């Protein structure tokens, strides 16, 4: 599954990442997915989602919501760190999201992904750079 959408009224990049993950978890839950892998280029977000301590920072409410969604709705989940240079698909989806006119225009792809990202995935699998 891939998704792109415009988020508004954000305070920082970590909050944007957390909101995107929370929205993705809600979609995956509604689709009945029991096993997921989240990939992020934000090490702080990965740590926040997986550590036992409660986060009392500016993004605490969003972190708690994402954790709750993970713990209650998925039998198996992994949160993986992927360095930004290796995460070209996320970069393309972010560019697509920025081009959307409003937050009501979110796009979700279950299997037939847009060409702009499917070419990147194909080249990554082949070990090439597009």
Question: Predicted regions: what is each one?
Answer:
Residues 1-130:
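Primary recognition of RNase H-like, Mg2+-dependent phosphodiesterase/nuclease domains
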């Amino acid at each position: 599954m891939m998704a792109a959408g415009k988020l508004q009224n954000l305070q920082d990049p970590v909050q944007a990442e957390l909101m995107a993950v929370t929205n993705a978890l809600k979609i995956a839950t509604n689709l009945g997915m029991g096993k997921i892998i989240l990939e992020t280029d934000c090490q702080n977000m990965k740590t926040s989602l997986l550590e036992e301590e409660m986060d009392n920072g500016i993004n605490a409410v969003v972190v708690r919501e994402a954790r709750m969604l993970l713990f209650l709705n998925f039998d198996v989940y992994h949160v993986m760190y992927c360095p930004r240079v290796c995460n070209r698909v996320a970069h393309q989806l972010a560019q697509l999201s920025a081009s959307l006119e409003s937050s009501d225009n979110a796009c979700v792809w279950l299997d037939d992904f847009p060409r702009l990202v499917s070419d990147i995935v194909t080249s990554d699998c082949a070990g090439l750079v597009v």
